[in-house]
């Protein structure tokens, strides 16, 4: 591929494979994590499959991605199927499969999604934008952790950076940072889905202990439409996340961008 293509666009590039809603993609090293691709780029590829589908109604409203197994390096196949289409909403089932050593397709990721036609009505928010310094005066933090996908994002932490001392001291799990794609790229639904998984595991900050952790399931709600995303351009987004419950080997977090 041409080097003029943004790494995100290379990573979510899908080729139709004949049957409607069937696509083939290829993992890239640009978004590689410890044992597979960064979870956000997998979510972005699923959003791309929906938007590329000839029967797609409207724009993404939400997507839930369940990471059943690590996606291996190489080819993968996506099936995106609209199971119900209403006047304003459309409901989707998606799977990602890869061949095993015998060549049999094995499910590695499942997802559900909703797309919708947005109509102008009353709107409001109960979550105010925090007062924080602009990204121009917050220094960029060099990539942390030694995995390639961290090089794909410009991160400028305000609060809750990854622990500098792993001493087991418990603290609040809130992280705030300015973040955007690196190199800069105009914001769209695929990029926003990718950004939604940018937060390191809350348990690391909460306990300051090196604990094996990975995303099992993520849900993204797209409250912004095409116009709002276009207005954001290539600028930074303020991102924040906080854990809510840590129990019996699992934990959650609530995040906003």
Model-derived segments and their meaning:
Residues 1-257:
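Terminal targeting signals and extreme-terminal segments of soluble enzymes
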